[in-house]
């Protein structure tokens, strides 16, 4: 995703390199990646919509994703979402004029190609799509 309407941010979080790709207004997060072992397999999660996790800090959901990836001996994980709109409440996300985000399909496909395994984890609210 090398476009001028995205912002890519990096951070070293403990043993993990972290990268987040946002829209230029940062109301959308297209992907969040953590890598702690470049040689190991990579796990891709597709979830509902981003909450508060950033390149610097996990939210509770992303923390669970990281723990699962580490427990299953993956060396990295990436989170993409069926809606890129950042909100802690799925009901509010549904009120957004454009909850998917212009570059979200590209981010999901990129994540599927990047990961060795993809987990669909968007729950019941995904029927809104």
Which residues make up each language-model segment?
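Short acidic (Asp/Glu) patches
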Residues: 30, 59-66, 97-106
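Short, conserved, surface-exposed binding loops centered on an aromatic residue
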Residues: 35-37, 70-71, 109-112
């Amino acid at each position: 995703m090398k476009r001028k309407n995205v912002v890519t941010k990096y951070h070293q979080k403990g043993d993990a390199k972290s990268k987040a790709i946002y829209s230029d207004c940062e109301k959308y997060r297209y992907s969040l990646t953590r890598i702690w072992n470049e040689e190991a397999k990579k796990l891709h999660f597709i979830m509902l919509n981003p909450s508060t996790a950033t390149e610097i800090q996990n939210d509770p959901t992303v923390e669970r994703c990281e723990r699962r990836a580490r427990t299953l001996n993956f060396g990295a994980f990436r989170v993409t979402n069926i809606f890129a709109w950042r909100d802690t409440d799925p009901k509010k996300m549904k009120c957004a004029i454009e909850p998917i985000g212009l570059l979200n399909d590209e981010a999901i496909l990129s994540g599927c190609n990047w990961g060795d395994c993809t987990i669909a984890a968007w729950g019941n609210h995904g029927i809104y799509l």
